[in-house]
Amino acid sequence: MTDHAAVETGADSRPDTRPTKIMYVAEATAHGGRSGYITSQDGQIDLKVAMPPAMGGDGDGTNPEQLFAAGYSSCFHNALVLVGRRAGYDLTGSTVAAKVGIGPNKQRGYGLAVALSVSLPVIDQEIAAKLVDAAHQVCPYSNATRDNIEVTILLG
């Protein structure tokens, strides 16, 4: 966790999206990187991790990109339901799917790109777009990735 007092401010014009109060802390431990397993402190996660075939692995396990996609889609959907409820809309039947891609970046490391596909079948498209925009401002994953990785949101 970052010591907020140690973070310099002023030069960056982006809004401060750091939490003012930590409500929950998740804890997970990786053993063996992309060829091992991961566990959560509470025992809810105990998964084998493997490189996907597209990256030269056997695909016999989950991978960080799948876990990121699961986390982002779940978090964004929760933010969408929250802003919908605040605006008086019932979003029953809505879904959010995430695709997370990984590839080399210009700094000789690796980067991610995300595509979120949002389905709001019973909501007018104009209203749906406003709800999606509002959810993108509320979602912790969106706040964490903003101006850092490419995130495309498709409304269908």
Q: Where are the predicted features?
A:
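Extended beta-strand/beta-hairpin segments
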Residues: T2-A70, H77-G156
